[in-house]
């Protein structure tokens, strides 16, 4: 069992080192997009499935509540939390539109949509990103593997260089925390 633990920790460390080497500028770019939107009284929307939905909720909570320091509440919403909207849209329009329909109803020009997908191929996240672009929103992808089709829809694509979902998810929440910390420093 100790060998398994060591293997997991070493894989995490290797992925972290790649993120450190390759993604600092992309994280910086994403933070600037978020900070500018929030300073212009715009909101941040986030979406994802499964663990990525949990990350979306976590990041939104850090912005609406607080992260490390006292500051005003910042407008952020995870599109995965409204079960009535999710089930109504899923039933009437299909699961691939559960986020896009919410973006259609909630997004205003200048808002930010952060789409989280370990594969970069989640159809409902992709459709939400397309809708956000149509509405004049900035788009940020927290992605994995090669970034998939979602990468091409992003103003800032943060693609974790790994094909292992657990490693990608670990980096996504760390990157989310870094974004929250950078946002904190601006308010």
From Swiss-Prot:
Classification via InterPro entries: GmhA/DiaA, Phosphoheptose_Isoase, SIS_dom, SIS_dom_sf, SIS_GmhA/DiaA_subfam
Start and end residues of each SIS domain: 34-187
Pfam families in alphabetical order: SIS_2
Reaction(s) the record says it catalyses: 2 D-sedoheptulose 7-phosphate = D-glycero-alpha-D-manno-heptose 7-phosphate + D-glycero-beta-D-manno-heptose 7-phosphate
Sorted UniProt keywords: Carbohydrate metabolism, Cytoplasm, Isomerase, Metal-binding, Zinc
MF (Gene Ontology): carbohydrate derivative binding; D-sedoheptulose 7-phosphate isomerase activity; zinc ion binding
GO cellular component: cytoplasm
Cysteines paired by S-S bonds: none
Residues given in the record as Zn(2+) binding sites: 58, 62, 169, 177
Any GO BP: carbohydrate metabolic process
Cofactor: Zn(2+)
Chain sites annotated for binding substrate: 49-51, 62, 91-92, 117-119, 122, 169
Keyword Mitochondrion recorded: no
Top EC category: isomerase
Free-text remark on how the cofactor is bound: Binds 1 zinc ion per subunit.
Primary localization class, coarse: cytoplasm
HAMAP family xrefs: GmhA
Subunit text: Homotetramer.
UniProt cross-references to PANTHER family, sorted A to Z: DNAA INITIATOR-ASSOCIATING PROTEIN DIAA (PTHR30390:SF6), SEDOHEPTULOSE 7-PHOSPHATE ISOMERASE / DNAA INITIATOR-ASSOCIATING FACTOR FOR REPLICATION INITIATION (PTHR30390)
Family: Belongs to the SIS family. GmhA subfamily.
Note in the entry: The reaction produces a racemic mixture of D-glycero-alpha-D-manno-heptose 7-phosphate and D-glycero-beta-D-manno-heptose 7-phosphate.
Function: Catalyzes the isomerization of sedoheptulose 7-phosphate in D-glycero-D-manno-heptose 7-phosphate.
Protein name: Phosphoheptose isomerase
Source species taxonomy: Bacteria, Pseudomonadati, Campylobacterota, Epsilonproteobacteria, Nautiliales
């Amino acid at each position: 069992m100790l060998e398994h633990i060591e293997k997991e920790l070493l894989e995490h460390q290797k992925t972290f080192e790649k993120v450190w080497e390759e993604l600092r500028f992309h994280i910086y770019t994403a933070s600037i997009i978020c900070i500018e939107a929030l300073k212009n009284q715009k909101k941040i929307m986030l979406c994802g499935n499964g663990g990525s939905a949990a990350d979306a909720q976590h990041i939104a909570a850090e912005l609406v509540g607080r992260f490390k320091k006292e500051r005003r509440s910042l407008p952020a919403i995870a599109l995965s939390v409204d079960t009535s909207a999710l089930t109504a849209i899923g039933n009437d329009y299909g699961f691939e539109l559960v986020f896009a329909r919410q973006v259609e109803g909630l997004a205003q020009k200048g808002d930010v949509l952060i789409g989280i997908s370990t594969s970069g191929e989640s159809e409902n996240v992709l459709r939400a990103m397309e809708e956000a672009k149509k509405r004049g929103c900035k788009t940020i992808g927290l992605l994995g593997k090669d970034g998939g089709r979602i990468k091409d829809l992003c103003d800032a694509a943060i693609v974790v260089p790994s094909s292992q979902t657990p490693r990608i998810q670990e980096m996504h929440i760390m990157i989310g925390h870094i974004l929250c910390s950078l946002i904190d420093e601006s308010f």
